[in-house]
Amino acid sequence: MSMTGAIVNALAIVAGGAVGLLFQRGIPERVSKTVMIGLGLCVLYIGISGAFACQSILIVIVAMTLGAAAGALLNIDGAIHRLGTWVEAHVHRHEGGPSLAEGFVTASLLCCVGAMAVNGSLDAGIRGDNSILLTKSMIDLVFCAMLATTLGAGVMLAGAAVFVVEGALTLLAGAIAPLLSEAAVADLTCAGSLLVAAIGLNQTGATKIKVADYLPALLFVPLIRWLVSLPAWQQIAAWF
């Protein structure tokens, strides 16, 4: 288990917000768009390389299918967007500029809620691998720099929220890690990496995958692994 990713991510948000305050006139859209696409390609590479850790592609396929179905039925992606809309409607700007609350809530929502934060924290807690959270840190740094040019210093405060959320998820993942077999960890890494690859594709503008709807797959992977390890299942499998 490693908290490095959560700490660096929090500091990156603070640094990004500070950079944004220095460039109140705004960062040229051409520059920010090009940088974000480049980071998206890096995210895509991390996702693809991590997917090769798979122990049982069949378990991952079943988990992704069940997870996608559950996520679509629950409309997780839609719920996240509705939450964002609700926040925008209830956090108002002061006269003459944005409030600290607006910058804090908006940046916290955008940086804390997402497959990359969840999967990165799980990876840091279970395998001690911070690569996803460190990549997310670079993305958040650039994103918060752009956000701070319009929402002000409140964006920097989101670093605390991100540390609490990602830190808690990392500690939780570290606590359950001893309960997971090596095969379960490998398949969980594979499923999570597929979600990270989807985020990378979205960030480049190539696709518009509702990645949040696939998050339940991360719960189905260890569940299916546990089921297939039961003696009853192994007896059934032996018949075939």
Annotate the PLM regions.
Residues 59-102:
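Glycine/small-residue-rich loop that forms an oxyanion/phosphate-binding "nest" at active or ligand-binding sites
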Residues 9-22, 41-50, 63-72, 113, ...:
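Hydrophobic core segments of alpha-helical transmembrane domains in multi-pass membrane transport
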Residues 19-33, 49-55, 147, 151-195, ...:
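Transmembrane-helix boundary and interhelical-loop signature of multi-pass inner-membrane proteins
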Residues 100-175:
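Helix-loop-helix junctions within the multi-pass membrane cores of secondary transporters/permeases
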Residues 29, 44-58, 85-94, 238-240:
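Hydrophobic transmembrane alpha-helices of multi-pass solute/ion transporters
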Residues 1-15, 58, 62, 126-137, ...:
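Structural signature of hydrophobic alpha-helical transmembrane segments
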Residues 30-40, 61, 85, 156-165, ...:
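Cytoplasmic-side transmembrane-helix entry/capping segments in multi-pass membrane proteins
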Residues 225-240:
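Juxtamembrane boundary at the C-terminal end of a transmembrane helix
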